[in-house]
């Protein structure tokens, strides 16, 4: 962990899921209630360092690198779908062997933890999803309105193009950090530096590139199971915190009606924050999360 995040940093561990060696970090405090932090797409587990540092005195905190992300193995083929991600989380929890669990996820990670919570509601204490309800309803309608042959053609063409898509390289860490800050203008300098250091790998030619598989960008051609996902949301028995950045592209789950599928939810909208709420307004986010969890943050 960088000096900005404090502490000595987490320890690295691995587990296996579907023959892939996957990575996770452990922030210590074993014996306390388990808290798992799940990152979003094209991100990495160390983006949770600041959050984990605040919560490790209350929880045994761990955070996985999703398949194809960070220091986890890349899938062979195109196996980057929600079923695989949820299975990986279930496998991690079986590997750790602690229950029940509190889950926090961002974006794709938020969708993953909500799926898991709906499949295994008895295993959960509380769930927090930061913009983790999936694509906005209008986008889903647009995509699902296309015939299957068009969706299949688009997917095939995307998959065929990915081998020729060269990952972006940066001559220095400073260049990579500049790109990080341009994509996330709300980031503090310390946060941008931290996310960059842990988000890149140095190549043989001396350049840097982001630590994720380009194939994670592709989504499958089959329709998003709106009714199935809503059923899973409705099966969650534990309290749910839904967080959204007021300046994000993500749809408001209260006004668009999706929040009504949860039995027991709290909604928090954070001003001057985009999609990465926990980075953009860290202290405000921690206030909401700490209040929801019932701990000092």
Where are the regions that the model predicts?
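Alpha/beta-hydrolase fold catalytic core
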Residues: 1-36, 56-59, 97-100, 134, ...
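Conserved loop-alpha-helix segment in the C-terminal half of the alpha/beta-hydrolase fold
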Residues: 230, 234-273
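Short glycine-enriched nucleophile-adjacent loop
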Residues: 110-121, 127
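Flexible "cap/lid" loop of the alpha/beta hydrolase fold
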Residues: 125-169
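Conserved HGGG/HGGXW glycine-rich cap/lid loop of the alpha/beta-hydrolase fold
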Residues: 25-74, 258
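Catalytic histidine-centered segment of alpha/beta-hydrolase-like enzymes
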Residues: 273-286
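Conserved alpha/beta-hydrolase catalytic His-Asp/Glu region
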Residues: 164-223
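Active-site loop/oxyanion-hole signature of alpha/beta-hydrolase fold enzymes
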Residues: 17-18, 25, 56, 62-108, ...
């Amino acid at each position: 962990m960088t000096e900005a995040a404090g502490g000595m940093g987490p320890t690295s561990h691995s587990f296996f899921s579907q023959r892939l060696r996957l990575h996770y970090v452990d922030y210590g405090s074993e014996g306390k209630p388990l808290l798992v932090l799940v990152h979003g797409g094209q991100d990495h587990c160390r983006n949770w360092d600041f959050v984990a540092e605040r919560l490790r005195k209350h929880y045994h905190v761990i955070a996985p690198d999703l398949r194809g992300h960070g220091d986890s193995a890349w899938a062979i083929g195109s196996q980057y779908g929600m079923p695989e991600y949820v299975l990986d989380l279930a496998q991690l929890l079986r590997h750790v062997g602690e229950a029940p669990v509190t889950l926090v996820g961002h974006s794709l990670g938020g969708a993953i933890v909500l799926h898991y919570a709906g499949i295994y509601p008895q295993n959960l204490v509380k769930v927090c999803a930061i913009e983790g309800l999936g694509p906005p309803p209008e986008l889903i309608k647009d995509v699902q309105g296309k015939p299957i042959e068009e969706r299949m053609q688009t997917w095939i063409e995307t998959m065929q193009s990915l081998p020729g898509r060269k990952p972006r390289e940066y001559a220095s860490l400073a260049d990579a950090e500049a790109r990080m800050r341009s994509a996330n203008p709300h980031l503090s300098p310390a946060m941008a530096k931290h996310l960059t250091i842990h988000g890149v790998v140095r190549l043989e030619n001396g350049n840097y590139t982001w630590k994720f598989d380009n194939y994670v960008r592709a989504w499958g051609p089959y329709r998003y199971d709106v009714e199935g996902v809503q059923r899973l949301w409705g099966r969650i028995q534990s309290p749910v915190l839904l967080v959204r950045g007021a300046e994000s592209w993500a749809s408001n789950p209260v006004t668009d009606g999706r929040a009504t599928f949860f039995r027991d939810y709290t909604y928090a909208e954070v001003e001057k924050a985009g999609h990465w709420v926990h980075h953009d307004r860290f202290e405000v986010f921690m206030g909401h999360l700490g209040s929801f969890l019932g701990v000092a943050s």
